[in-house]
A protein has these predicted regions:
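Catalytic toxin/effector domains delivered as secreted proteins or via bacterial secretion systems
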Residues: 1-147
């Protein structure tokens, strides 16, 4: 790994991170029935995409058994600020997610960690995104209850 590649893989505390949430897990998160983040995560700065199709294509979300399809009208992401990611990151697979070609953005695989206080869920549609809720450490607060 070159020095530039190594630097591209560093996650400093406070780095904005995000995880694409499979459609079947959005409601369990919002209802408080799911309280961990695990799997492939990305730095938010590496994922300035225009809509669900870009997420699907660039992040290789069409792996075998995936809930994602190229035709999704919306996609949900969870965003949070990294804390000590060294303790939760596992080495990336040599060939990318589920054996597909590596995404064109750095990907990180996190072992299960609790959803951090202040994490947010956003809904992304082509050309725009909508804030859905923020985690206060006990529940997800939606805009009508204060942001």
């Amino acid at each position: 790994m070159t020095q530039a590649e190594h630097m591209a893989r560093i996650i400093e505390p406070g780095t904005p991170m995000q995880k694409v949430i499979p459609p079947r897990l959005v409601e369990p998160y919002l209802a408080g029935r799911r309280s961990v983040i695990a799997g492939y995560v990305y730095r938010t700065m590496d994922c300035a995409f225009r809509g669900p199709a870009d997420f699907y294509r660039v992040l290789n979300l069409g792996y075998e058994g995936s809930d994602f399809t190229a035709e999704l009208a919306e996609i949900y992401v969870m965003r949070w600020r990294a804390m000590d990611m060294d303790a939760s990151l596992a080495p990336p697979l040599a060939d990318g997610a589920a054996g597909l070609a590596r995404p064109s953005v750095p990907e990180f695989y996190t072992l299960p960690i609790p959803v951090p206080v202040g994490a947010e869920i956003h809904r992304i549609v082509p050309g725009s995104e909508e804030f859905i809720a923020r985690y206060d450490g006990q529940s997800w607060l939606r805009p009508s209850r204060g942001r």
